[in-house]
Swiss-Prot record:
Pathway: Amino-acid biosynthesis; L-histidine biosynthesis; L-histidine from 5-phospho-alpha-D-ribose 1-diphosphate: step 3/9. It comes from Pseudomonas paraeruginosa (strain DSM 24068 / PA7). This is Phosphoribosyl-AMP cyclohydrolase. Keywords: Amino-acid biosynthesis, Cytoplasm, Histidine biosynthesis, Hydrolase, Magnesium, Metal-binding, Zinc. Its main location: cytoplasm. Catalyzes the hydrolysis of the adenine ring of phosphoribosyl-AMP. It catalyses: 1-(5-phospho-beta-D-ribosyl)-5'-AMP + H2O = 1-(5-phospho-beta-D-ribosyl)-5-[(5-phospho-beta-D-ribosylamino)methylideneamino]imidazole-4-carboxamide. The lineage of its organism: Bacteria, Pseudomonadati, Pseudomonadota, Gammaproteobacteria, Pseudomonadales. It is found in: Cytoplasm.
């Protein structure tokens, strides 16, 4: 029997881009990377677990902030080289900047304009964890 993880086209570093979307609204919340272990754990634990390239280890989304992403559905694109996680974003904040989405800037007239508010000060989110913003 073929392993479902073998169907994924991992990049040269053994990673695949993972896009998290709100399962109700479809809004793109963030993009991160997953290795084979992260994706397998995400599927088995029904929560988003990524691979932190800067830390070189698994990153359980929400382990420091409390902003866990509960998995509702996992999708693979037609080229098998990108996954989408349809998630429930606990606390409504996906971005380390304290915003709902990491995609909070819009290109307008030759510049990037911030269009989404900070819902919670990042220092208040990470004050107890000594977090390095990823």
């Amino acid at each position: 029997m073929k392993d479902w993880l073998d169907e994924i086209h991992w990049n040269a570093d053994g990673l695949v881009p993972a896009i998290a979307q709100d399962h109700e609204t479809g809004r793109v919340l963030m993009m991160a990377w997953m290795n084979r272990e992260a994706l397998a754990l995400t599927a088995s634990e029904n929560r988003a677990i990524y691979w932190s390239r800067s830390r070189g280890k698994l990153w359980r989304k929400g382990e420091e902030s409390g902003h866990v992403q509960k998995l509702h559905e996992l999708r693979l694109d037609c080229d098998a080289d990108v996954v989408i996680l349809m998630v429930e974003q606990v606390g409504g904040i996906a971005c380390h900047t304290g915003r709902e989405s990491c995609f909070y800037r819009v290109y307008e007239n030759g510049d990037w304009k911030v269009v989404d508010p900070v819902l919670k000060d990042p220092d208040a989110i990470y004050e107890h964890a000594g977090h390095q913003h990823e």
